[in-house]
Amino acid sequence: YLNGSFSHDKNSFNGLELIKNKNVDLVIHINSLSMNKLELDTKLTNIVIGHPNSKFSSIPDIFIPIGIPGIDYKGIMFRTDNVVSVNLKKIRDIKLPTLKYIFDGLI
């Protein structure tokens, strides 16, 4: 919010552009759902909080595996257009922390 109206700079809020242009020195990747290979920039410090079977283009500086929503713990999944929400139930007990647990510990 700037000068009485909303302001949005697409370059300031585009994570890929910030990384590509070397405007950051630390990248925190959060992904509890996908096992797709995550491309890491080895010139930056990379912290990954994610799926226990995550694959990486290079070894991250820090990797914290977390549980998968709807499998390892209950939760709510929202569609990005906010049309539907789905209650998720825990179906196994793998003893991995939730993302919330990790964030609460950091705060």
Where are the predicted features?
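Non-catalytic alpha/beta scaffold blocks inside enzyme catalytic domains
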Residues: Y1-I107
